[in-house]
Curated annotation (Swiss-Prot):
It comes from Mus musculus. Residues 117-126, 134-147, 479-503, 792-803, 833-843, 1069-1086, 1141-1156 have a biased composition (Low complexity). The gene is Cramp1. Residues 57-71 have a biased composition (Pro residues). This is Protein cramped-like. Residues 1-161, 456-519, 579-673, 766-843, 994-1055, 1068-1107, 1132-1172 are annotated as: Disordered. The keyword Nucleotide-binding does not apply.
Length: 1285
């Protein structure tokens, strides 16, 4: 026999022999420890061959069950002490057992028998309760107690048979690590022995380990209650392993002694996952360990690797990008004057529901806000019915993102540096060790079988059902699978699943009965119930019953107009008609709700069954209005309540998994792709995402750089309408018809106010009437964002076309076509364009310009929740369109964004506007070196503070028509073209930025000029075309060559205005000199020209604010500042004031030109200074140009004629960049230049023209090598001449 001890074959023979033992032998031996173990082995062997239901004791074991003596610790210790039982207490019948199992390696006959029995009893939990405690105890304590009696050699091997405390600890360590892998446990024990230097002969072998495993299991099975959830749907091996692991924890804390008290604690530990034991005067908290064996048990497929078990560190915040899911969602947000594309940075530990709540408030329709304020003043009885919206905001994963189902998340920890996700371990879920005690082991092992573990259960404490319900749709499939169901054992799981929710479940603990299935089923009921009954949708908004035309409209409640049209039908359509329509509406599930065909049938049953008895849903689809009126109850509460009640009633809705499939179908069959598809269809709503954090979504999407989510408004699923708590709502809904009628009246009044508030009523009414009768328009909800639909709203990919923008904005919105899909609310926040652009340019035709203030602005709260709210609204019906001017579209006010400034040809010091009037100044530059004619151009000088002209290049659209006899001079013409002469209207350019400037066409410019004073065609006429290189169109006025002019100002004082203007206008308008015409001898760098563009009224800050690049013009540029004062044409400059200007005093420029100069007499423009000035001297003239701010800053320093260069210095004139002058501090430079000019102008005896030339010469000599690329084309013109000659 000794030879057979280690032999596996002998073990098998022993098992067979033990299996053949008769029942009477077992009964006789039952009182002895060996007999007890033999009975265990035989019964369990038999059970292994034919498994019985758990809890049914083996028939032959009726006698062993009541054996109390073995239960006493004294007997056990006595058996441990005695190596050989007395013959009086050991019947002789034990000999066959001893012989049969004597081959058991070191464990004696009992060891082998218990081993065989344990292996077989692994399939059944029923055999275990009958095992005598004493027998199993003695066998576990002293395995070979009866072995030595048979064979003397056994005494030597008794060391093998005894399991010391250390051995047992090692065994349980191995059990924690490897589970029911006896060889691995044996290797673990051998390794530990080897480390301690113990002889190899003391190492337990695999058979001994197996014996000990089963003996210990048999010892504890008697105390485990197998009638509870723990045993249902769970594999026998899983029960064994989990029970032994829990027993090992209990044994570690309080020892292995099992009595009734400890048995209760063991049951509590198994069922709840944690227990508190009073031991040696201390309260010990014992938790079910989350060891690798249970991990394998819960995740047999190995999906959760060891790396995955570690908490995942995620960034603290992640950018989230929200995009509309379809055109309807885009138009809804756009109509609220909000950006449909939203980017934000969110913390990952936030709940998705909080994000949805934020968006819901941010994008609340204005009528919703008004309704909320109004409902505060309405009847208490019916006001609550109206609070629920028909559409709910849902978030969806991005279109291109890949969703991978997540294992369960135990918790998301938020620290200063990281957002850490701790996994849950149960049911293919991972969990941190700290959180395992919060899960009942039954849930850890996936006892819910096919139903899966709802995320809400992760938080539920022991036997409480207060899990953070709502259940997540997301992880149900992932969490659902327990290791027990993933292999061949899924078949028993399927069978056991219905019993979970069956009415015979009361034998379970109450907390478990509720926490598992009800939390599991909460989303199921919500999905299944609400998805297929548009009744809730038709009754969710103020009207409790649906209307015939509304039904199609409310299928997609994203269209604002059906809501308003419906308000009038509330008053007209009889209630019977509405109820009839709700029946027809039942056949058409809403487009927004995506119910798979598999879901429709069960969920319909669920709707009927889950309705409370008080509701009595009607046989067809005709639910009473009362049912629809219950949509105001909190979704979560009602979903939980309905699932609880349906559990007790055993309703079919209980068997629906979160995918809408019956729970009897194991959820592991639901592939991850189907879960992802479900998420893409249903998304996350406020209710289903209550316990879902953004960290989980982030992990699900594969840790992208940014979370790309889509949003849409879907019809409210309305699980609450079939809630069991609906009796109160039923009574509420059965309120008097007058209350309902009053409610509808108030709702209609609200909508009328919303539409009447805006003067564009006719347009909206047409659109509303068209939209209400066109159900096909609802199908546009599925239109891709870029598809052109016949609506005027811009699709998300629309490009901003400035020309269509201008045309659309200028047309009154009443002229817009009544396109059914127009997504304007009754206060059109989008001004629709004309019909010509409505359909053809629907993608790019309408640039949404909010004509009313956004709802969240401080002006938007028109309706204060006062007690006289209804009276005020009725009064508004009559007068709101007149008195509320801020609802009317404002005159177009372009956004004052400082965009990239347009490129201009010269740099100017811009004036700051005075208190009452902004000086619109135009600088006129003379380029007198052209061989054809002296050319110049005008450029308007805009103040950055001038609102009307800010970032709008002034283009001469309309030139004032004047008599031919009083033709304007060139400067006057430039002033008119700049829009600064009071007689000419200031042209406003409709542009949103520099990129959209509409250039003045050549025909317009030429016609305008020639119509004013052109005497005939001229060969030098150059039409004014916008220079495309610059976004600021400018005009260059050519000077006629044929009119020579005399040297000084005083030379021809009698030259009249018409003469010069006629001559000037004969060449028409020409564009600035191209590079081919420009002379190569222009020396001044761009910064010099910036210094020379001296506009007297302008402080230097304006140049900085304009930010236009400096461009050079010529050495001898005369910047004549034209004031925008009153112009009278008949006042010439007094020659006496100009007599001091002598040609001999003018300093020559670097090169002199024989060409006639442009300024020949003071009559070139007699109106270039304010005519109301009493003193026409130069000092008073230029003093009038100085702004008050500049005059306060002026220093009365007298600067010499040659001090320009010394004051301005070469450091300010370096040509490192085109904006080198602007990039420096302009305050000192401009102060010097302005003060120098003032001194110049105050000295009447000095020719101010020569002083200008002197200053220009000194500034240009400083840097002669700089050339301007734009004008350095190499044209062979003559050099620049002195203007005063």
């Amino acid at each position: 026999m000794t030879v057979k001890l280690g032999d596996a074959g002998s073990g098998e023979e022993g098992l067979k022999k033990l299996g053949k033992r008769t029942a009477d032998e077992e009964s006789l031996d039952g009182e002895g420890p060996g007999g007890a173990d033999a009975a265990d082995s035989s019964s369990t062997k038999r059970d292994g061959q034919t498994p019985r239901a758990s809890g049914a004791p083996a028939p032959p074991r009726g006698l062993p069950t009541p054996s109390p003596p073995q239960g006493s610790p004294q007997d056990q210790h006595h058996f441990l002490r005695s190596s050989v039982r007395p013959q009086s207490k050991r019947p002789r019948k034990d000999a066959p057992c001893a012989l049969g199992s004597g081959g058991a390696s070191g464990s004696g006959p009992r060891g082998k028998g218990s081993d065989g029995g344990a292996s077989s009893s692994g399939n059944v939990s029923g055999a275990t309760p009958a095992t005598p405690a004493g027998g199993s105890r003695s066998s576990s304590r002293n395995i070979g107690s009866s072995g030595p009696e048979k064979e003397e050699g056994k005494k030597v091997r008794r060391q093998w048979e005894s399991w010391s405390t250390e051995d047992k600890n090692t065994f349980f360590e191995g059990l924690y690590e490897h589970g029911k892998d006896f060889e691995a446990i044996q290797n673990n024990i051998a390794l530990k022995y080897k480390k301690k230097g113990k002889p190899a002969s003391m190492v337990k072998n695999k058979e001994q380990v197996r014996h000990f495993y089963y003996r210990t299991w048999h010892k504890i099975t008697k105390y485990i209650d197998f009638d509870n959830v723990f045993s249902r749907g769970l594999k026998k091996s899983s029960q064994e392993l989990y029970g032994l692991i829990c027993y090992g924890e209990l044994r570690k804390k309080i020892g292995g002694c099992m009595d009734d008290k400890n048995a209760t604690k063991l049951n509590e530990l198994i069922q709840v996952g944690a227990t508190t034991v009073r031991y040696k005067g201390r309260n010990l908290r014992i938790k079910a360990p989350m060891c690798r064996a249970l991990k394998k048990l819960c995740d047999p497929d190995g999906l959760s690797d060891e790396e995955d078990q570690k908490p995942v560190r995620l960034p603290l915040k992640v950018p989230v990008e929200l995009q509309p899911r379809n055109n309807h969602a885009w138009a809804r947000v756009q109509s609220l004057a909000q950006n449909p594309r939203l980017r934000m940075i969110v913390e990952l530990h936030r709940k998705v529901s909080s994000l949805i709540e934020f968006l819901k408030q941010k994008w609340a329709l204005h009528e919703v806000r008004i309704r909320k304020t109004l409902e505060e003043r309405q009847l208490q009885g019916s006001s609550t019915v109206q609070t629920q919206e028909k559409v709910a905001l849902h978030l969806f994963p991005g279109e291109n993102c890949t969703l991978t189902p997540l294992p369960g998340v135990a918790r998301v920890v938020h620290s200063k540096a990281f957002c850490t996700v701790h996994w849950q371990e149960g049911g293919r879920c991972k969990q941190g060790t700290k959180d395992i005690h919060s899960l009942p082991p039954a849930q850890i092992l996936g006892i819910q079988s096919g139903q899966g573990i709802a995320r809400g259960q992760l938080k539920c404490q022991r036997s409480s059902a207060e899990g953070k319900g709502g259940g997540r749709l997301l992880p149900t499939a992932d969490a659902s699978q327990s290791s027990g169901e993933s292999s061949p054992e899924s078949a028993p799981a399927e069978g056991a699943a219905p019993s979970l929710s069956s009415p015979d479940a009361p034998d379970r603990p109450h907390g478990l009965q509720d926490s598992g299935p009800h939390l599991e089923k909460t989303p199921v009921t919500a999905l299944a119930v609400g998805r297929d009954s548009p009744i809730q949708e038709s009754g969710a908004l103020p009207c409790p019953c649906g209307q015939p035309p509304d039904l199609e409209d409310e299928l997609s409640l994203l269209d604002p107009f059906p809501r308003y049209l419906k308000s009038c039908q509330d008053l007209i359509i009889p209630e019977q008609c509405r109820r009839a329509d709700t029946r027809s509406g039942r056949e058409h599930p809403p487009l927004g709700s995506v119910a798979s065909p598999e879901t429709l049938t069960p969920s319909s049953g669920a709707v009927a069954d889950s309705a409370p008895p008080g509701l009595d849903p009607q046989p067809g689809t005709d639910h009473q209005p009362d049912t629809r009126l219950q949509s105001d109850i909190c979704t979560k509460e009602l979903a939980n309540a309905s699932s609880e009640e349906s559990q007790e009633k055993g309703s079919p809705s209980e068997h629906l998994s979160s995918q809408g499939q019956p729970a009897t179908r194991p959820s592991k069959e639901v592939p991850a792709s189907q879960l992802a598809q479900q998420l893409r269809e249903e998304g996350w709503s406020l209710q289903t995402s209550e316990s879902l954090t953004l960290a989980e979504v982030y992990l699900m999407m594969g840790k992208p750089t940014k979370l790309q989510l889509e949003y849409d408004w879907l019809a409210v699923l309305g699980p609450e309408s079939q809630a069991p708590t609906a009796q109160g709502q039923t009574a509420l809904s059965r309120s008097s018809p007058s209350a309902l009628h009053q409610q509808r009246l108030l709702s209609c009044l609200l909508r009328l106010i919303s539409t009447e508030v805006h003067p564009k009523m006719a347009f909206e009414a047409n659109t509303a009437s068209t939209a209400s009768v066109r159900p096909t328009q609802e199908e546009q909800s599925t239109t891709p964002p870029g598809k052109v639909v016949t609506i005027n709203s811009r699709s998300p990919r629309c490009s901003r076309n400035p020309s269509t923008l201008r045309s659309n904005k200028t047309f009154p919105s009443a002229s817009a076509p009544c396109s059914p899909g127009l997504r304007n609310p009754p206060r059109p926040l989008l001004v629709a364009g004309p019909s010509s652009t409505g359909s053809s340019d629907s993608d790019g035709g309408l640039f949404a310009v909010p004509t009313t203030l956004p709802p969240n602005s401080r002006h938007g709260k028109l309706f204060s929740p006062s007690k006289e709210a209804e009276l005020t609204f009725r009064q508004h019906l009559d007068s709101i369109s007149i008195q509320s001017d801020f609802f009317s579209p404002k005159p177009k006010k372009l956004r004052k964004r400082h965009l990239r400034k347009p490129l201009v040809v010269q740099r100017t010091l811009l004036p700051r506007p005075s208190e009452n009037q902004s000086h619109n100044v135009c600088s006129f530059s003379i380029l007198s070196n052209s061989p054809i004619a002296g050319r110049g151009w005008f450029r308007p000088i805009q103040s950055s503070l001038t609102k009307a002209a800010l970032s709008r290049p002034i283009v001469p659209k309309v030139l004032p028509s004047q008599a031919t006899s009083h033709l304007p001079s060139a400067i006057d013409l430039a002033a008119q073209s700049a829009g600064i002469i009071p007689g000419s209207p200031l042209p406003i350019l409709d542009t949103d930025g520099s990129s959209g400037i509409s250039p003045l066409s050549s025909e317009q410019a030429t016609t305008a000029i020639s119509g004013q004073g052109d005497t005939g065609p001229h060969q030098n006429r150059d039409p004014v075309t916008a220079v495309r290189g610059t976004n600021d169109p400018f005009i260059s006025v050519t000077r006629p060559e044929q009119e020579p002019m005399t040297d000084g100002f005083q030379g021809s004082p009698a030259l009249t205005l018409p003469e010069l203007s006629k001559a000037n206008l004969q060449n028409g308008l020409s564009i600035p000199l191209p590079s081919s015409e420009s002379s190569s001898t222009r020396l001044s760098p761009p910064n010099v020209s910036a210094l020379l563009d001296i506009s007297l009224p302008g402080p230097p800050e304006d140049v900085l604010s304009q930010g236009e690049p400096a461009t050079q013009i010529s050495d001898s540029i005369i910047e004549i500042a034209i004031s925008s004062g009153q112009y009278s044409e008949g006042v010439p400059l007094s020659p006496a004031k100009l007599n001091g200007s002598d040609s001999s005093k003018s300093l020559p420029s670097p090169s002199s030109s024989p060409q006639p100069n442009w300024i020949a007499s003071p009559t070139h423009d007699p109106q270039w200074y304010p005519s109301d000035s009493a003193d026409s001297s130069l000092s008073s003239l230029f003093a009038s140009f100085i702004s008050p701010e500049k005059s306060r800053k002026m220093l009365p320093t007298t600067v010499g004629a040659n001090s320009g260069t010394s004051l301005l210095g070469p450091s300010l004139l370096d040509g490192n960049s085109r904006d080198s002058f602007v990039s420096r501090s302009l305050a000192d430079v401009a102060e010097v230049v302005d003060s120098q000019l003032v001194c110049m102008m105050n000295e009447n005896s000095i020719d101010y023209i020569s002083r200008f030339n002197d200053l220009a010469q000194e500034l240009s000599i400083t840097e002669p090598g700089r050339r301007e690329v734009l004008f350095d084309g190499g044209g062979g013109g003559n050099p620049v001449g002195d203007l005063s000659q």
